[in-house]
Amino acid sequence: MPEIVDTCSLASPASVCRTKHLHLRCSVDFTRRTLTGTAALTVQSQEDNLRSLVLDTKDLTIEKVVINGQEVKYALGERQSYKGSPMEISLPIALSKNQEIVIEISFETSPKSSALQWLTPEQTSGKEHPYLFSQCQAIHCRAILPCQDTPSVKLTYTAEVSVPKELVALMSAIRDGETPDPEDPSRKIYKFIQKVPIPCYLIALVVGALESRQIGPRTLVWSEKEQVEKSAYEFSETESMLKIAEDLGGPYVWGQYDLLVLPPSFPYGGMENPCLTFVTPTLLAGDKSLSNVIAHEISHSWTGNLVTNKTWDHFWLNEGHTVYLERHICGRLFGEKFRHFNALGGWGELQNSVKTFGETHPFTKLVVDLTDIDPDVAYSSVPYEKGFALLFYLEQLLGGPEIFLGFLKAYVEKFSYKSITTDDWKDFLYSYFKDKVDVLNQVDWNAWLYSPGLPPIKPNYDMTLTNACIALSQRWITAKEDDLNSFNATDLKDLSSHQLNEFLAQTLQRAPLPLGHIKRMQEVYNFNAINNSEIRFRWLRLCIQSKWEDAIPLALKMATEQGRMKFTRPLFKDLAAFDKSHDQAVRTYQEHKASMHPVTAMLVGKDLKVD
């Protein structure tokens, strides 16, 4: 079989050598906005007579490379846009197969590192101390330290991080104590250990004025003090979710499961950094209604972090299985009808992505080809929701949830600590269901896996909780001007916040609505007063797409006060598409760009066709 190549990495592939361990020693400089230190990589040759190897780097300054106490020659290659620069290291001795060597690289990051966001004190809740956080997925670890920046290689790590002593450092690892910095009494060194091998996109660091509160036997929630109480309340279901996840996936091997609530510019809903999930503060709805994101990140402890996509072309393996587990966790907590409600909502999100890209766009394929494509640019709900839809369809085809969950647990056990491709997954599916090969052969695999657009088959969904959302949405969509008086606040009295959100999602699919309808909707439902981020996002999109000028400042405010890309990018796009707000949207972006997360700033710039 031909070797799978990771087209997103410039480093030597796993067939040549593998990084087994990283020992990171670094110092965080908030004045210069740099991380300076050494990365000691234990590398194992996978072939005989290995004389040199290549690592990924991006915007790094390399001071020197030392092997066995001796400086060795290295060469930084030409920058290849988003992939960074390959770093070739000459080895002092030729390695034989399985021989290990420790390569110590002294490096410094750039203030513009795409992996890091440096916040001024004014950008924090406490307004007193600066803040730093990393986001390495998919291919930004190379902008922190030289590495084989591919999910096909897994390594353990230890770290020692020096920070100003009034701040706290956390990593995607078990905390291993803190000591005064012997070289600077105004600083402290925090130590970490990660004994489970992980792909380097799961290396994570945060430094800030952080406090914690225990919310479960293996869970602390961390944030600035202003958010700690609210976060502890919002995420109180964490331990019960973990227990259900263990029942579905097998033992939780990571020891601790902490949560970190980041400042508003964090670009994602959550990031499954091991031992320390990162989440957006936009989940703080006050009623635990957005806790499915926690169920999702918990589920990654099995699908993604234990069983990992071998390359980003197979990202759906991480996300489709994780959404499938997430929805089972929520189903166990809130009922099977709720699982189906969320599943159908996900199909709607998939429809939106396919509509946005166009039904023949290659990014709407489940398995993508990222040759010369930045994974950040290809990112969408497709791997999540098309991936989930395939698994949900297979569940129904193969005999129901219990049967398919049996497969999922066996899949996790089979591929734990490994990195795999779609073919590995499919081969195991066929071997697990060897008595149902005829059923599996009914699946149009080429359409599901390799063709663009919506899947060839839509699974069956229980409509119980969705029907009320559709009914109310249809009333608004079909209403004539004379009918608007028939709407009143009691329309919503029996709807949960999840259903209210789905009502808006359904209505948004039919936007624009007549402006009079939107104004009446605000009059009777007072949506402007709702702070639930998912509801507010869809409401403001509906307003802007229906050309309500009064909503422009509200939409601009939401697009800039937080930076979760799920919200910020569509809001900016809608504002730019409305003639009355186009110039203001571009101007607002340009004013905020310097203080935005680097990836968010880049992608919004592309969306708005500026820069």
UniProtKB/Swiss-Prot annotation:
PROSITE patterns: ZINC_PROTEASE. The active site is at E297, Y384. SUPFAM superfamilies: ARM repeat, Leukotriene A4 hydrolase N-terminal domain, Metalloproteases ('zincins'), catalytic domain. The modification Phosphoserine is found at S416. This is Leukotriene A-4 hydrolase. Keywords: Acetylation, Cytoplasm, Hydrolase, Leukotriene biosynthesis, Lipid metabolism, Metal-binding, Metalloprotease, Phosphoprotein, Protease, Zinc. Changing Q137N: Aminopeptidase activity almost absent, but keeps LTA4 activity. The gene is LTA4H. The record marks D376 as: Essential for epoxide hydrolase activity, but not for aminopeptidase activity. Pathway: Lipid metabolism; leukotriene B4 biosynthesis. GO terms for molecular function: aminopeptidase activity; epoxide hydrolase activity; leukotriene-A4 hydrolase activity; metalloaminopeptidase activity; peptidase activity; RNA binding; tripeptide aminopeptidase activity; zinc ion binding. Its EC number is 3.3.2.6, 3.4.11.4. It comes from Homo sapiens (Human). Changing E385Q: Reduced aminopeptidase activity. Minor effect on epoxide hydrolase activity. Changing H140Q: Aminopeptidase activity almost absent, but keeps LTA4 activity. Pfam families: Leuk-A4-hydro_C, Peptidase_M1, Peptidase_M1_N. Changing E319A: Complete loss of LTA4 hydrolase and peptidase enzyme activities.
